UniProtKB/Swiss-Prot annotation:
PANTHER family, sorted: MITOCHONDRIAL DNA REPAIR PROTEIN RECA HOMOLOG-RELATED (PTHR45900:SF1), RECA (PTHR45900)
GO cellular component assignments: cytosol
Family: Belongs to the RecA family.
BP terms from Gene Ontology: DNA recombination; DNA repair; SOS response
Function: Can catalyze the hydrolysis of ATP in the presence of single-stranded DNA, the ATP-dependent uptake of single-stranded DNA by duplex DNA, and the ATP-dependent hybridization of homologous single-stranded DNAs. It interacts with LexA causing its activation and leading to its autocatalytic cleavage.
NCBIfam families: tigrfam_recA
Listed SMART domains: AAA
The protein's name in its UniProt record: Protein RecA
């Protein structure tokens, strides 16, 4: 009796594998080769290509060395917090690797002089200033489907005004129109973004919800669809000023990885954004270097490999700016210890310390 039942189980497993093979071949005949496969059989599917954000500490906090290609990214925060700066720095990094980038300027507020200062190559940057939200998203869809664009930035979701609102009267109430537009666009975009390996960055603004008694009253514009479709969400805030004597020369900025489908979320980093320069790379090297024990700090003096960098943080930054070889050595050492730095030294903001709706948004 036992032998009969054993044979029956074996027959079932053979039947299952045959049925699976038949189903797979039928799917491939109907939808083309590669429409279904075993995930481990193609190494290119498993490994995710990334583009640096221009901030070493943020690259480490993201867990994969930058922002993932073929995914949707959302960067949100208050006014003048550095959202567009971070997006432009990502474009500059992609262009350094030979990538083609596009900027959909729905706010009609891009400053080309500032973009050039951040390292953006304006000659090869594609720019569009659409009149309506539908036009902006149609342009985005066409560029993504072309398969030729590596990074596309939409600035911003709040400025994607539906055509019905523009053609209507001032004061007309059109509830949920923008949210429906975003939901439909993301449904269409998500598959072509993945296939074309194009990273689409949505910059978003924040609004206040009325009557919230518990939790954060902040929310982002454009409904909830973007929160679900985004693989990475970054909350960027200005937390202070960088001063030289009495003059303010930059912002102290905190970025929290609110959602991350590629690595553990809720990592939090702080860095300086200098006016007319962007993210202070040398400042990050000094701060992260000290935390990781690569740069030694004795009193006010900073040193690396027994070589003095300077007295005080600003002097150490100046030394690294003037000596790029030393700066590159420190950066290489930090990138080699990225996992250790992320686990030990980057603050974990926790799920509650972000935007109101987002407690459970870890991939």
């Amino acid at each position: 009796m036992a032998q009969n039942s054993l044979r029956l189980v074996e027959d079932k497993s053979v039947d299952k594998s045959k049925a699976l093979e038949a189903a797979l071949s039928q799917i491939e005949r109907s939808f083309g080769k590669g429409s279904i496969m075993k995930l481990g059989s193609n190494e290119n599917v498993v490994e995710v290509e990334t583009v640096s954000t221009g901030s070493l500490s943020l690259d480490i906090a993201l867990g994969i060395g930058g922002l993932p290609k073929g995914r949707i990214i959302e960067i949100y925060g208050p006014e003048s917090s550095g959202k567009t700066t971070l997006a432009l720095q990502t474009i500059a990094e992609a262009q350094k690797k030979g990538g083609i980038c596009a900027f959909v300027d729905a706010e009609h507020a891009l400053d080309p002089v500032y973009a050039r200062k951040l390292g953006v190559d304006l000659q090869s940057l594609l720019i569009s200033q659409p009149d309506t939200g539908e036009q902006a998203l149609e342009i985005t869809d066409t560029l993504v489907r072309s398969g030729a664009v590596d990074v596309l930035v939409i600035d911003s979701v709040a400025a994607l005004t539906p055509r019905a609102e523009i053609e209507g009267e001032m004061g007309d109430s059109l509830p949920g129109l923008q949210a429906r537009l975003m939901s439909q666009a993301l449904r269409k975009l998500t598959a072509s973004i993945s296939k074309s390996k194009c990273m689409v960055i949505f910059i978003n603004q924040i609004r206040m919800k009325i009557g919230v008694m518990f939790g954060s009253p902040e929310t982002t514009t454009g409904g909830n669809a973007l929160k679900f479709y985004a693989s990475v969400r970054l909350d960027i805030r200005r937390i202070g000023a960088v001063k030289e004597r009495e003059e303010v020369v930059g912002n102290q900025t905190r970025v929290k990885v609110v959602k991350n489908k590629m690595a553990p979320p809720f990592k939090q980093v702080e860095f300086d954004i200098m006016y007319g320069e962007g993210v202070s790379k040398t400042g990050e090297l000094v701060d992260l270097g000290v935390k990781a024990g690569i740069v030694e700090k004795s009193g006010a003096w900073f040193s690396y490999n027994s070589q003095r960098l300077g007295q005080g943080r600003e002097n150490a930054k100046t030394f690294l700016r003037d000596n790029p070889d030393t700066a590159n050595e420190i950066e290489l050492a930090l990138r080699q210890n990225a996992g250790l730095i992320a686990d030990r030294f980057l603050q974990n903001g926790g799920p509650d310390a972000g935007e109101g709706d987002d407690g459970s948004d870890e991939g």
